[in-house]
Design a protein with these regions (language model features):
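Core Rossmann-like FAD-binding/catalytic domain of the broad FAD-dependent monooxygenase superfamily
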Residues: 1-198
Length: 198
């Protein structure tokens, strides 16, 4: 209660994020690197981490648990003949850094415009334009920003955490910086940049 539907937390004994879903919460728990995946996924360890986050007299019901290995990839080209790629099929980034779903929606929006024009008689070369417009945005914004978000979230050094919080606070206190940050993090800036590529 009292939490945002998406909550990222730094704490002394491990960072975590919470995502509210219908009738349940998804917890992404970060475990110390010295633990094996088996140790990290033990029922008792997960229960203890959840109790640290939200103390309860009852054990938490765990629907699924798995280790996610962070990796990022991007295809060379978003189209090959009549094969078209968008979203995670075109660019894969850490879900803890965000950006992937919205980036995929932006891919789909751009591609839909091209397909509509082709349906109405334009040349198939528009599919090459789709790839030229979306790939650099994925490289420079989606993957880069997701990686920065993930690194900030997993930072353990208290001094670096304080610095990151101070930087975020400075952004919120400056209307120009705030607007610039929002345009980038909402990926509106990327949509505009993509439209300039011919």
């Amino acid at each position: 209660e009292g939490l945002s539907s998406v909550t990222y937390c730094w704490q002394k004994n491990g960072n975590f994020s919470l995502l509210q879903l219908p009738n349940q919460w998804r917890a992404s728990l970060y475990f110390p690197e010295e633990l094996s995946p088996e140790e990290a996924l033990s029922e008792d360890r997960i229960q203890q981490q959840l109790q640290d986050i939200c103390p309860s007299t009852e054990r938490f019901k765990i629907y699924d648990k798995r280790v996610y290995r962070v990796h990022q990839r991007i295809v060379d080209k978003y189209n090959h003949g009549r094969i078209l790629l968008a979203g995670d099929a075109a660019h894969l980034n850490s879900p803890s850094g965000g950006m992937g779903m919205n980036g995929g929606l932006h891919d789909a929006h751009n591609l839909t415009e091209k397909l509509n024009k082709i349906w109405n008689g334009d040349d198939l070369s528009l599919l090459d334009l789709y790839s030229r417009q979306r790939k650099p945005i994925a490289e420079r914004q989606i993957i880069k920003q997701a990686d920065q978000n993930r690194k900030r979230m997993t930072e353990k050094d208290p001094t670096k955490r304080r610095k990151a919080l101070a930087e975020m606070r400075a952004i919120t206190e400056d209307p120009v910086k705030c607007k610039s940050f929002l345009m980038k993090s909402s990926m509106i800036e990327g949509l505009r940049e993509a439209d300039l590529i011919i």
